[in-house]
UniProtKB/Swiss-Prot annotation:
Organism per entry: Vibrio cholerae serotype O1 (strain ATCC 39315 / El Tor Inaba N16961)
Taxonomic lineage from the root: Bacteria, Pseudomonadati, Pseudomonadota, Gammaproteobacteria, Vibrionales
Protein name: Carbamoyl phosphate synthase large chain
Cited InterPro entries: ATP-grasp (IPR011761), CarbamoylP_synth_lsu (IPR006275), CarbamoylP_synth_lsu_oligo (IPR005480), CarbamoylP_synth_lsu_oligo_sf (IPR036897), CbamoylP_synth_lsu-like_ATP-bd (IPR005479), CbamoylP_synth_lsu_CPSase_dom (IPR005483), MGS-like_dom (IPR011607), MGS-like_dom_sf (IPR036914)
Cofactor detail note: Binds 4 Mg(2+) or Mn(2+) ions per subunit.
Binding site for Mg(2+) 1: 285, 299
Length: 1076
């Protein structure tokens, strides 16, 4: 049946900010849904609070609202836009929960809005654990023994039934949030209390443990005529007990017999029918006991998910796009498959003749004190996917694409160390982020496949594959470079060995291996992802490399530009950089260039087969990029858009004769190399905080006496502030050198005078060699010392004088010309006592580019991409800075709730995973919306606790009187209370934890506070007050760790975040009117 004509406009709910467990795969699905529905002629209204997404670009929908995904705000949008239908299956758990709230509060009924894609009942049946259990029993499928509990009392009753170990999961949460595995009563109590607190319905599911079982996922699509297809069967390499988002996964499933596959296939179709998913994609998870083959169903998601993004990229079948069309009445046989150019309908199940491996990317090094063992709560922040002709090639490509410094199965353990075996056994049994490398070490240490299986429960088939790779490495090592003949080298390349890994095994340079390959003419060929195992001709250039005979790349001789993507998401390099890469591809495609994308992140829009003309799904390493350049011969390569990943390759690419366009690699180096940069700064006569570069600890102490404390210390060349700290005295400085870094002539350490209480400012600008245009000046809300990626910011600036801003504009222009920037640049300043200090310059796309583009309506990444290929700013009509007639505030989202034990104090090391944007007529309204967007709801009044550091005591009086005016009663710790008392404000005095009971923590646990302001500096003070911040986090009390944020919060109390809604299109029209 063709599409429905009784609905004209559809509201799509996005997923909001990126958090662990819900990342940019929902930008990919939402963007696809917008495109699919608009090409069918529907009016699309989109709501998403995350500005760093492609789906919130003004061209993607008819009306785009960057507003909080909160049911009261969405009600305002429904009232204004009057959509006929709402599609909630594209925005993850956030969108489902919001849709259920709209249903519950009667909003959908009030405005006559129909839910499409999934009914409220189907969502509820799949999400509500007890209803799901009953439903599965009714169709003869077994679930793990389990029951729900709404209190600790009930939880203990369930425990008697399931026994230890048991798995605890809160209802309606995402990425296993708040869940875990309990092995004893103490852990059981801790996880249950946390889980009851985190579940929006205060309900837990307690399951028997299936630890060590095999885990599978089926991606299923069903239409309203009951046509069903399995898009992909995914097998988890890691067994049950590790969240599937943290597992290495493989597609197609490798260890199922055909009979088992058919049983599972039939079961998944039965699940969709029973739950009532009539239109769209779902993912169904199964566990199989390897001992007796008992199969249980673990859960199903009645929506597009992380796995469906992976399945789409793995097969070339666009699940989200198809699901969106099914939601408006199409059936699978009516839709044509794009990849085969319409030669096959969407009702053909994809078949694949290659192996896909996904490996998660973790960031534990950023969370000191976090438990880094993997459990049922998701902890990874990104993922990489690789495609190969066999499991071994696929795995090794994924390992090098991960960018954790591994070129393959690199050694982790020194096997001669006395505790080597103990260490390996621990790492195999208690899985951490690096288990796969320890498995290889176990084989090197002589363990058998059975020995490894007994510790890991990983299927022996996978272990044999790894064991063989380890044996091959040993043979190659023994044969030496001389023994690397044509046959051996070709065999190693077919098994996925990188040049870098071979060079490490043989002790020669990577270049020598590359020369040898050239001599033997051993080069990769490119095969196409075509959904049909080459049965039909593919129109789509979606390629992966392998060492085979026939190459299917068929390059053209058009003018081509190649964009290098950012690889897997991680903290400090996320979706913002992917956004820039997509914009580069779109802009140059519009201008008639053929665009080529190289990336290996399955979650993103950049790896969608129709974002660029040609997509190479390959690791972003020197070897892989050079191989593609050899085949495609592009006219230019863009390295400034994918963050640090491609930037690191700039010099080596240039040396290999690759045309790197935009700012030259030498200019990039002048900005990143401390000494070269200082020469430029001195030549221009600009101010920097006093600083020094040291190569030994004694030298550091001598310099620190000249500069003075506090100091910011960090190793040179880092992104996202790795190993960066603020030290307050000499003793602290010595500790840093002993614990945090190894300092040497090769790796110097930088010391900078820390400008306490300075205001930090970010500026994005574009230079074409003739003129510099400022994209936006953003004033940070958190003071200097908080990493710019973790600070909220306002555009336009909300306190800076015109004079200071003009000083910055002048300096930006000088710097751009001095460094020879062609394209984007980002500059960070600090303002203190009316002086402007230069902190750093990055001649590349920064993470603020999407936010500035949304706030001003100027697509900076597109404009700069055109500058790189030679268009001037004047030709593009972008010649002056746009200052919008409204305020936009960017606020960040932090993942501390996933890492109990980590201090949530903000500092110079970046730890946020995502961002939201709020827009308002005043700064207060914009800030209030941004806070609501990241889920902080500040109650009116109540009791506030103030405990601040020495340097903040002057300003705390002002803050206290503002809080009193807002109706708060105040508590304060001793030092703060004295200052307030002198000013005539008398707070209740409370004890610090070591001062006797009842102390602060008791009061937090009793829910006495609605707001906490706690600032601390100096090692000891930070350590002492950590319990207060952890307590606030654990008991969901709103807290701020900087005074600036506290003042901004007070201001936001004067505005109503839910009062008005404005679309991006309306905002940009206002900007244009204002310009005129």
């Amino acid at each position: 049946m063709p599409k429905r004509t009784d609905i004209q406009s559809i509201l799509i709910l996005g997923a909001g900010p990126i958090v662990i467990g819900q990342a940019c795969e929902f930008d990919y699905s939402g963007a696809q849904a917008c495109k699919a529905l608009r090409e069918e002629g529907y009016r699309v209204i989109l709501v998403n609070s995350n500005p760093a997404t492609i789906m919130t670009d003004p061209e993607m929908a008819d009306a785009t609202y960057i507003e909080p995904i909160h049911w009261e705000v969405v009600r305002k949008i429904i009232e204004k836009e009057r959509p006929d239908a709402i599609l909630p299956t594209m925005g993850g758990q956030t969108a489902l929960n919001c849709a259920l709230a709209l249903e519950k509060h009667g909003v959908l009924a009030e405005f006559g809005v129909e839910m499409i894609g999934a009914t409220a009942d189907a969502i509820d049946k799949a999400e509500d654990r007890s209803r799901f259990d009953k439903a599965m029993k009714s169709i003869g499928l077994e679930c793990p023994r389990a029951d729900t509990a709404k209190s600790m009392e009930e939880a203990y009753k369930v425990l008697d039934m399931v026994g230890f170990p048991c798995i605890i999961r809160p209802s309606f949460t995402m990425g296993g949030s708040g869940g875990g595995i309990a092995y004893n009563r103490e852990e059981f109590e801790e996880i249950c209390t946390r889980g009851l607190d985190l579940s929006p319905t205060n309900e837990l599911l307690i399951d028997e443990s299936l630890i060590g079982w095999k885990e599978y996922e089926m991606e299923v699509v069903r239409d309203k005529n009951d046509n069903c297809i399995i898009v992909c069967a995914i097998e988890n390499f890691d067994p049950m007990g590790i969240h599937t988002g943290d597992s290495i996964t493989v597609a197609p499933a490798q260890t199922l017999t055909d009979k088992e596959y058919q049983i599972m296939r039939n079961a998944s179709l039965a699940v969709l029918r029973e739950i009532g998913v009539e239109t769209g994609g779902s993912n169904v998870q199964f566990g199989i006991n390897p001992k007796d083959g008992r199969m249980v169903i673990i859960e199903m998601n009645p929506r597009v998910s992380r796995s469906s993004a992976l399945a789409s990229k793995a097969t070339g079948f666009p699940i989200a796009k198809v699901a969106a069309k099914l939601a408006v009445g199409f059936t699978l046989d009516e839709l044509m498959n794009d990849i085969t150019g319409g030669a096959t309908p969407a009702s053909f199940e994809p078949t694949i003749d290659y192996v896909v491996t996904k490996i998660p990317r973790f960031n534990f090094e950023k969370f000191a004190g976090a438990n880094d063992r993997l459990t049922t709560q998701m902890k990874s922040v990104g993922e990489v996917m690789a495609i190969g002709r066999n499991q071994q090639e696929s795995l090794q490509k994924a390992l090098r694409g991960l960018e954790v410094g591994a070129a393959g199965l690199d050694e982790k353990v020194d096997l001669d160390a006395p505790d080597a075996l103990t260490k390996i056994r621990y790492e195999l049994k208690e899985a951490g982020a690096e288990r796969i490398w320890y498995i290889a070490d176990a084989f090197r240490a002589g363990m058998s496949v059975d020995g490894v299986f007994n510790l890991t429960n990983i299927d022996r088939w996978f272990l044999v594959q790894i064991e063989e790779l380890v044996k091959l490495e040993a043979e190659v090592k023994a044969g030496g470079f001389a023994g690397l003949n044509q046959d051996v080298l070709r065999k190693m390349k077919r098994k996925g060995f990188s040049d870098a890994r071979l060079s490490k095994l043989l002790g020669v340079s990577e270049n020598e291996i590359r020369r040898l390959r050239d001599q033997y003419n051993i080069h990769p060929v490119y095969k196409r992802v075509d959904t049909c195992a080459a049965e039909f001709k593919s129109d789509t250039a979606y390629m992966y490399s392998t060492y085979d005979e026939e190459c299917e790349a068929n390059p053209t001789d058009k003018d081509k530009i190649m964009v290098l993507g950012g690889g897997p998401n991680r903290i400090g390099q996320g979706i913002e950089f992917d956004y820039c890469c997509v914009h580069a591809a779109l802009a140059l495609r519009e201008d008639g260039y053929e665009t080529i994308m190289v990336n290996c992140n399955p979650e993103t829009v950049s790896t969608d087969y129709d974002t660029s003309d040609r997509l190479y799904f390959e690791p972003v390493t020197l070897e892989d990029v050079l191989a593609i350049v050899r085949v495609e011969k592009p006219k230019g390569v863009i390295v400034q858009y994918g963050g640090q990943t491609p930037l690191k390759l700039a010099r080596a690419l240039e040396a290999a004769g690759v045309p790197v366009i935009g700012t030259s690699p030498d200019a990039i180096d002048r900005a990143e190399d401390r000494e070269r940069f200082q020469q430029a700064v001195q030549r221009l006569g600009l101010k920097q905080p006093d600083n020094a570069t040291v190569t030994a600890i004694e030298q550091a102490i001598e310099k620190s006496r000249e500069i003075g404390f506090p100091l910011v210390v960090r190793p040179s060349y880092v992104l996202g502030g790795r190993a960066m700290e603020i030290v307050y005295d000499e003793q602290d400085l010595r500790r840093y050198f002993n614990e945090a870094v190894s300092v040497s002539n090769e790796s110097p350490v930088l010391l900078d005078r820390f400008l306490d209480d300075a205001t930090e400012v970010d500026v994005d600008a574009i230079c074409d060699g003739e003129r510099v245009v400022i994209g936006g000046i953003m004033e940070h809300i958190e003071q200097a010392g908080v990493h710019s990626g973790d600070s909220a910011c306002s555009l336009p600036a909300y306190t800076l004088s015109q004079e200071i801003q003009d000083k910055m504009r002048e300096q930006v222009e000088k710097l751009a010309f001095e460094l020879g920037v062609r394209g984007l640049m980002n500059i960070q300043f600090a303002v203190k006592d009316n002086e402007v200090y230069l902190i750093e310059v990055n001649p590349r796309a920064a993470r603020t580019v999407p936010f500035v583009s949304k706030a001003t309506g100027a697509p900076l990444a597109k404009i700069a991409a055109r500058v790189m290929v030679g268009q001037t700013l004047e030709q593009q009509g972008f010649t002056k800075e746009i200052i919008p007639p409204y305020y936009s505030v960017k606020e960040v989202v932090l993942p501390f709730n996933k890492f109990p034990g980590v201090d949530p104090l903000l500092g110079p090391e970046m730890r946020s995973t995502g961002e939201v944007m709020g827009v308002g007529a005043t700064f207060a309204e914009a800030y209030a919306k941004a806070e609501l967007g990241c889920g902080s709801v500040y109650p009116e009044g109540g009791r506030a606790l103030l405990s601040v550091r020495e340097g903040d005591k002057q300003r705390v009086v002002d803050l206290a009187s503002k809080l009193v005016k807002l109706g708060y009663q105040l508590d304060a710790t001793h030092g703060t209370a004295v200052i307030l008392g002198e000013a005539g404000i008398n707070p209740r005095l409370v004890n610090k934890v070591h001062e006797g009971r009842p102390h602060i923590l008791d009061r937090i646990k009793n829910h006495e506070y609605t707001y906490i302001v706690n600032t601390a500096s100096g090692r000891q003070a930070i350590e002492d007050s950590k319990v207060l911040r952890r307590g606030a986090l654990a008991h969901k009390v709103n807290y701020t760790t900087t005074l600036n944020a506290a003042f901004a919060t007070c201001m936001s109390h004067t505005a109503d975040a839910k009062a008005s809604v404005t679309s991006v299109q309306e905002l940009h029209a206002r900007v244009k009117a204002n310009q005129a």
